[in-house]
């Protein structure tokens, strides 16, 4: 794909991520709050608080993967694979906290 060409599914992915950010603001905020708590924590609390952060990120990642997969299932296999790559890349740019393991879901 040319660097000057917009991704094929960019518009639908933008709308999906807009919807995620509106409907799941609590999940995004919780992950941010958990990370802030971990960063402020004393050493003896840090491990548990990091686990809480990871759990919050996993929740967001699962929700995003569900959105991706439900749309992907409406496409043929080749287009579905292209859409999945574009979706995962868009999550990495827009919501990087939730992108680290999205390709594993």
Which residues are covered by each model-predicted region?
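Short terminal alpha-helical segments
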Residues: 1-38
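Alpha-helical rod/repeat scaffolding segments in eukaryotic adaptors/tethers
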Residues: 6, 39-53, 73-84
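Intrinsically disordered, low-complexity regions enriched in small/polar residues
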Residues: 11, 40, 52-55, 85, ...
């Amino acid at each position: 794909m040319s660097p000057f060409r917009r991704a094929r599914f960019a518009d639908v992915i933008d709308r999906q991520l807009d919807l995620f950010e509106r409907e799941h603001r609590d999940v995004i905020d919780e992950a941010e709050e958990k990370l802030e708590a971990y960063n402020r924590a004393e050493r003896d609390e840090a491990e548990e608080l990091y686990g809480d952060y990871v759990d919050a990120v996993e929740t967001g990642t699962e929700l995003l993967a569900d959105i991706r997969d439900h749309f992907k299932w409406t496409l043929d296999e080749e287009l579905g694979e292209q859409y999945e790559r574009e979706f995962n890349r868009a999550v990495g740019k827009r919501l990087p906290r939730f992108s680290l393991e999205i390709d594993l879901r």
